[in-house]
């Protein structure tokens, strides 16, 4: 076998499910051909040669990390709301007074796709320096048919400019815009549902999301949105049960949803539905921390039910101003009780599943994309242990060094 690139003297954490949690192969090699993993195994069994061979001097190799829930495309600043929350005002109060998402909507509507993409690129660079190779980016700060499409075009532009894989999610049902105040159902019918059809037809969105909450959209409105998404051939996911138990996790599982995200208030019925549907529970400790919440997601119950759990930054200008996936993983361990292998799976294997990309990325397996992160650490646990340190040696995406 002739490889394009052969990595030798490596320690691999393949993240294929196994007894040690990491799928470790010591004294290993990995062969790449045509941007994909062509062979993995012990160095003593390398089945061919390569045009380029690189010795990694016992460095660890993992799948490139995946941030499966972000709001990286936006304009404007909401640091004053941070000050208001520090003064004791709740996020719900700020939102109802015209702040929160509505503030970002005003600024984002005034920006073009190029400006939005340029801002997102500065944020995505911080993730790249931590070994991230795939990022999900949501719309949701436009809330008109044209401005939401502008946000999705910006996300596609980020993919082209950054070299990273971007999964674009239509989140028009993020908040009710001012011009539809008190008429959320009419907004769903007149803006969100037609927009789903347009985004699917134009190839702008890979999935549809909604914010199902008392300050967002009702379960009935979310259901109408999901019916339209499925009819358009787009998978669904949901901001579910963050501030109250709305039955969101159960609802998105009913539609075979990719993920239920936040899920602090998800009940036993919702967990059972997620387990049955294979819906991933996405933990967002950055928002939990920034909002000073006390209700933790039901990690132990999801673990017992066999629900796959992912970890993401929820990077956004208001409730989770976090562009460090490694910090999010650290928080998920300390605040929510994930084990280190669970947190690592949450940034790789399970994050890929939350995006519907588990056949392409998330583990080191023959046939998958050669998206790799190489680390200067003694053990994989060290990658998550430290806050603020970036132990990344380098990234390989689609078989090429970045």
From Swiss-Prot:
Query: Which cofactors go with this protein?
Result: Zn(2+); Fe(3+)
Q: Does the keyword Translocase apply?
A: no
Output the GO biological process annotations, alphabetical, semicolon-separated.
L-histidine catabolic process to glutamate and formamide; L-histidine catabolic process to glutamate and formate
Q: How is the cofactor bound?
A: Binds 1 zinc or iron ion per subunit.
Q: Which residues bind Fe(3+)?
A: 69, 71, 239, 314
Q: What is its EC number?
A: 3.5.2.7
The residues listed in the UniProt record as binding N-formimidoyl-L-glutamate, with positions renumbered to this chain, are 141, 316, 318
Q: Where in the cell is it found?
A: Cytoplasm
Residue ranges spanning the membrane: these are: none
**Known pathway:** Amino-acid degradation; L-histidine degradation into L-glutamate; N-formimidoyl-L-glutamate from L-histidine: step 3/3
UniProt keyword Zinc, yes or no:
yes
Q: Which UniProt keywords apply?
A: Cytoplasm, Histidine metabolism, Hydrolase, Iron, Metal-binding, Zinc
Name one cellular component (GO) term: cytoplasm
Instruction: Recall the GO molecular function terms of this protein's record.
Output: imidazolonepropionase activity; iron ion binding; zinc ion binding
Q: What is its main location?
A: cytoplasm
Q: Name one Pfam family in it.
A: Amidohydro_1
| Superkingdom, taxonomy of origin | Bacteria
| InterPro entries for this protein | Amidohydro-rel, HutI, Metal-dep_hydrolase_composite, Metal_Hydrolase
Locate the residues binding 4-imidazolone-5-propanoate.
78, 141, 174, 242, 319
**Which parts of the sequence bind Zn(2+)?**
69, 71, 239, 314
**Catalytic activity as recorded in UniProt:** 4-imidazolone-5-propanoate + H2O = N-formimidoyl-L-glutamate
Function text: Catalyzes the hydrolytic cleavage of the carbon-nitrogen bond in imidazolone-5-propanoate to yield N-formimidoyl-L-glutamate. It is the third step in the universal histidine degradation pathway.
- Describe the family membership recorded for this protein in Swiss-Prot or TrEMBL: Belongs to the metallo-dependent hydrolases superfamily. HutI family.
Protein name as annotated: Imidazolonepropionase
Q: Say which species the protein is native to.
A: Maricaulis maris (strain MCS10) (Caulobacter maris)
Q: Which gene encodes it?
A: hutI
């Amino acid at each position: 076998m002739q490889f394009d690139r052969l990595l030798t003297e490596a320690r691999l954490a393949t993240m294929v499910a196994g007894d040690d949690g990491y799928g470790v192969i010591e004294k290993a090699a990995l062969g790449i051909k045509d941007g994909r993993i062509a062979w993995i195994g012990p160095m003593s069994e390398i089945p061919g040669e390569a045009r380029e061979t690189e010795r990694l001097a016992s460095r660890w190799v993992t799948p490139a990390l995946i941030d499966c829930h972000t709001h990286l495309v936006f304009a404007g600043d909401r640091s004053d709301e941070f000050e208001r929350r520090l003064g004791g005002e709740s996020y719900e109060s700020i939102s109802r007074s015209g702040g929160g998402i509505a503030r970002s909507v005003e600024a984002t509507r005034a920006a073009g796709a190029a400006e939005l993409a340029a801002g997102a690129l500065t944020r995505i660079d911080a993730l790249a320096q931590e070994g991230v190779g795939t990022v999900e980016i949501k719309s949701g700060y436009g809330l008109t048919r044209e401005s939401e499409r502008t946000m999705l075009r910006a996300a596609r532009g980020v993919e082209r400019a950054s070299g990273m894989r971007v999964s674009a999610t239509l989140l028009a049902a993020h908040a009710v815009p001012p011009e539809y105040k008190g008429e959320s159902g009419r907004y769903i019918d007149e803006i969100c549902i037609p927009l789903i059809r347009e985004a699917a037809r134009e190839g702008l969105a890979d999935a549809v999301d909604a914010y199902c909450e008392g300050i967002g959209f009702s379960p009935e409105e979310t259901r109408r949105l999901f019916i339209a998404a499925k009819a358009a051939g787009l998978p669904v996911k949901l901001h579910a049960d963050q501030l109250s138990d709305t039955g969101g996790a159960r609802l998105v599982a009913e539609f075979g949803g990719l993920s239920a995200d936040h899920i602090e208030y998800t009940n036993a019925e919702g967990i059972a539905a997620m387990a049955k549907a294979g819906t991933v529970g996405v933990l967002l400790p950055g928002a939990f921390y920034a909002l000073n919440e006390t209700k933790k997601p039901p990690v132990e119950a999801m673990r017992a039910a066999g629900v796959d759990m992912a970890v993401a930054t929820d990077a956004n200008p208001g409730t989770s101003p976090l562009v460090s996936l490694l910090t999010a993983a650290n928080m998920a361990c300390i605040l929510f009780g994930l084990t280190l292998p669970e947190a690592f799976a949450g940034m790789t294997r399970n994050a890929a599943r939350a995006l519907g990309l588990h056949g392409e990325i998330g583990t080191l397996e023959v046939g998958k994309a050669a998206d790799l992160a190489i680390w200067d650490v003694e053990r994989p646990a060290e990658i998550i242990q430290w806050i603020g340190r970036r132990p990344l040696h380098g990234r390989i995406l689609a078989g090429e060094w970045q």
